A protein has these predicted regions:
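Internal, well-folded beta-alpha domain core
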Residues: 93-243, 249
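Pocket-edge structural micro-motifs
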Residues: 5-7, 240, 252
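Active-site helix-to-loop segments that bind/position phosphate- or nucleotide-bearing substrates
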Residues: 4-95
Length: 252
């Protein structure tokens, strides 16, 4: 199976890596084009474009200027160990055992505003470029127009005709995939908490749960919807009444 995750704004380039394996992103030419455009933006421009503080504008200006090819293990880091948000705390990639790294690599794909789509061990350098950023790139009015064809083609080339495809990304990122031309149906998973007498999606918990579901899929080498329905990490369980077809709901 394949599953897609969103990236994280929070990055970790300090923790010692559990593996020396790394690969190269398939869309580095496109990434380089975007970086050349970002290099022309001042810190103040970036703050306005991304609706971030002056300090973050300066940080990302510095990141853009420092970004350069070729990527090596000394100036870049495998994506799954570089992202550090709630999803990645749920995934906890640092504790995935060596004998499961191939399953991780074959299963997880990370959508990215700068890199398009990443395999877990694809090298990345620090950046910030959310998919929803209103950045005009040549004739493309935004990053969705810039990336949609390449991302969808890249996924289709990898997907088997009957392979399970699970969306664990946010709407902002999943919109970068053209589901009309994707060669397999999309399975979705939502995670709800019982609060004030009803079940609802709470963003912080839902993000962590997406990461935990990705970890579960790797741990169990999930291949079918029934495999996914067994997800029981951190108190979650599958809700048959709330689920419908390929839209799975897990509650706790």
């Amino acid at each position: 199976m394949k599953l897609v995750l969103s990236p994280a704004k929070s990055l970790n380039f300090e923790t010692p890596l559990p593996t020396e394996k790394f690969t190269e992103s398939q869309f580095l030419k496109q990434s380089e084009r975007l970086n050349k455009l970002l290099k022309t933006k001042s810190a103040n421009n970036l703050s306005k474009l991304m609706s971030i503080s002056d300090a973050l504008g300066q940080l990302n200006y510095d990141r853009n200027q420092a970004w350069k090819l070729p990527f090596t293990k000394d100036n870049a880091r495998p994506a799954v160990y570089a992202f550090n948000g709630d999803v990645y705390k749920g995934l906890d990639a640092y504790t995935i055992p060596e004998n499961k790294l191939e399953t991780l690599q074959n299963t997880v794909r990370i959508l990215s505003g700068l890199y398009g789509v990443l395999k877990p061990t694809d090298l990345v350098q620090p950046y910030r470029l959310e998919m929803g950023t209103k950045l005009k790139v040549g004739a493309n009015k935004n990053l969705y127009e810039f990336w949609k064809k390449d991302i969808t083609k890249g996924l289709n080339e990898e997907l088997e005709d009957d392979e399970l495809f699970l969306n664990l990304a946010s709407n902002e990122y999943f919109k970068a995939i053209d589901t009309k031309t994707l060669k397999v149906p999309v399975i979705t998973a939502n995670f709800k908490e019982f609060k004030n007498g009803k079940y609802k999606i709470i963003s912080f918990y839902a993000k962590a749960a997406r990461g935990m579901m990705a970890r579960y899929a790797i741990d169990m080498d999930a291949k079918t919807i029934d495999d996914l329905k067994g997800f029981n990490y951190d108190g979650y369980s599958f809700s048959e009444p709330m689920s419908q077809g390929n839209d799975l709901v897990f509650i706790r």
